[in-house]
């Protein structure tokens, strides 16, 4: 018999596995050096001026926890995550701009937090996007529920939407160089 606790552990395992796969799919240092050399020689075709409103990756994985502080400690002690007050920040390289460091935030939230509302789910995914204003217009045209207005911070722009199954989604147009300047320990 599968209990709710086992279902929650399974969901967390799947979500965490996705995050690890995403973060580990980054360019190797050799590939990074090759791309930098191409860029210096002017033959780099990886740069893109594409401003199509779309998702470009996963920006964060958020989920409920009975005790976020203890859970962060468990992940740090057992899986080697570098933790901070929000969870753990994964660092990886942008495949199109290898000199650019990007981030993925992993965060346990205290069970019952209103941050996921109006969703009834125990998780929320943050997607990295480009051209958030254009994306919001596209979503409005498509009849998608937009929960709030775009909010701007030093480290990027955010808006929340609902998908067709009632999952709250956070969209983030990041300004990664600001996060890089802030520094702090990251999981690599």
Q: What do the PLM-derived regions correspond to, one by one?
A:
Residues 2-12:
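Bacterial N-terminal signal peptides that target proteins for export
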Residues 14-19:
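Hydrophobic helical h-region of N-terminal Sec-dependent signal peptides
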Residues 21-24:
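C-terminal motif of bacterial Sec signal peptides marking the signal peptidase cleavage site
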Residues 26-66, 85-86, 113-188:
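Vicinal oxygen chelate
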Residues 52-53, 62-107, 157-159:
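Core segments of cupin and vicinal oxygen chelate
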Residues 94, 110, 173-175:
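Residue-level signal for short segments within beta-strands and strand-turn junctions
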Residues 109-115, 179-180:
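A short, acidic/glycine-rich surface segment
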